[in-house]
UniProtKB/Swiss-Prot annotation:
Location in or out of the cell: Cell membrane; Golgi apparatus, cis-Golgi network membrane; Cytoplasm
Tissues expressing the protein: Expressed by splenocytes (at protein level).
Residues exposed to the Cytoplasmic side: 2-145, 206-211, 261-271
GO BP annotations listed: cell differentiation
Organism: Mus musculus
UniProt membrane topology term: Multi-pass membrane protein
Positions bearing N-acetylalanine: 2
Protein name: Protein YIPF3
One Gene Ontology cellular component annotation held by this UniProt entry: plasma membrane
Sequence intervals crossing the membrane: 146-166, 185-205, 212-234, 238-260, 272-292
Glycan-bearing residues: 334
Keywords carried by this UniProt record: Acetylation, Cell membrane, Cytoplasm, Differentiation, Glycoprotein, Golgi apparatus, Membrane, Transmembrane, Transmembrane helix
Signal peptide coordinates: none
């Protein structure tokens, strides 16, 4: 039993030198553990490096394509970009213009809104103030109340314009330097604004307690008497009737304004100067409106210049008979000449 085992062990122990290291490793290391520290660290990261490289190449290709596309768009859309910039500028200018117009409209509405309180009045109040403008009140110790609105005076001025137009058309007035409407509007508004400003200046010098708005309202309502007088006398052409209404109606409206100014002025000299100037201007303006646009003007011109006679007018005259023997032929000639003249005039 021991003899056959010897060769096996001898064979094993007598192995060649090429198997010596292997046997030493098997005999010396009884464990199959692999030392990971001695492994190459770069052996497992080769796939990751390839992925990063591929991704980098793709990004570079995308960037190159984008740059090329931008260059092509810049070359192709050069004129289109200029047009787009021009359209934006035009749109901006239109927006600015619309904004300016809107601001102007808003400012205009704001200005109209400022004037609204001066025209906010009821028709009943206007009617009562028209009647009060014809009734003078004697009250000197306290200032009389003056309406601070412009609706009634403005309507009276326009009414006076319409009456003047009616008077111009009925009297066949010829205005060479302007139209009838322009002349009437200029006359009425010029008197209202001009005289109001002048009297306000005198009131300031005379230390009267009245404002420009009150002066406009006072003189505007004072034109109510002028409207009544002119409306009646333009349709009824009687001088006596005009002078009667001029003294009564025009005088009442003037006395009303004078009473208001007297109550607001201190000192007899100042009162005389201010009230006398206003009364003279108001009454003379009514005379001017009557005689400037009435048929009386034509009668005055005819009286001063004489009747209209044609420059050359042929009148048949008798031929004097010098000798008694020639009386018969001369009588025949005169009769013939008269007959011819009558025949020519009939044709």
């Amino acid at each position: 039993m021991a003899t056959p085992a010897a060769p096996a062990s001898g064979v094993r122990n007598g192995a060649g030198p090429e198997w010596g290291g292997f046997e030493e490793n098997i005999q010396g290391g009884g464990s199959a553990v692999i030392d990971m520290e001695n492994m190459d660290d770069t052996s497992g990261s080769s796939f990751e490096d390839m992925g990063e490289l591929h991704q980098r190449l793709r990004e570079e290709e995308v960037d190159a394509d984008a740059a090329a596309a931008e260059e092509e768009d810049g070359e192709f859309l050069g004129m289109k970009g200029f047009k787009g910039q021009l359209s934006r500028q035009v749109a901006d200018q239109m927006w600015q213009a619309g904004k300016r117009q809107a601001s102007r409209a808003f400012s205009l509405y704001a200005n109209i809104d400022i004037l609204r309180p001066y025209f906010d009045v009821e028709p009943a109040q206007v009617r009562s103030r028209l009647l009060e403008s014809m009734i003078p009140i004697k009250m000197v110790n306290f200032p009389q109340k003056v309406a601070g609105e412009l609706y009634g005076p403005l309507m009276l001025v326009f009414t006076l314009v319409a009456i003047l137009l009616h008077g111009m058309k009925t009297s066949d007035t010829i205005i060479r330097e302007g139209t009838l409407m322009g002349t009437a509007i200029g006359t009425c508004f010029g008197y209202w604004l001009g005289v109001s400003s002048f009297i306000y200046f005198l009131a300031y010098l005379c230390n009267a307690q009245i404002t420009m708005l009150q002066m406009l309202a006072l003189l505007g309502y004072g034109l109510f008497g002028h409207c009544i007088v002119l409306f009646i006398t333009y349709n009824i052409h009687l001088h006596a009737l005009f002078y009667l209404f001029w003294l009564l109606v025009g005088g009442l409206s003037t006395l009303r304004m004078v009473a208001v100014l007297v109550s607001r002025t201190v000192g007899p000299t100042q009162r005389l100067l201010l009230c006398g100037t206003l009364a003279a201007l108001h009454m003379l303006f009514l005379l001017y409106l009557h005689f400037a646009y009435h048929k009386v003007v034509e009668g005055i011109l005819d009286t001063l210049e004489g009747p209209n006679i044609p420059p050359m007018q042929r009148v048949p005259r008798d031929i004097p008979a010098v000798l008694p023997a020639a009386r018969l032929p001369v009588a025949v000639i005169n009769a013939t000449a008269k007959a011819i003249a009558v025949t020519l005039q009939s044709h």
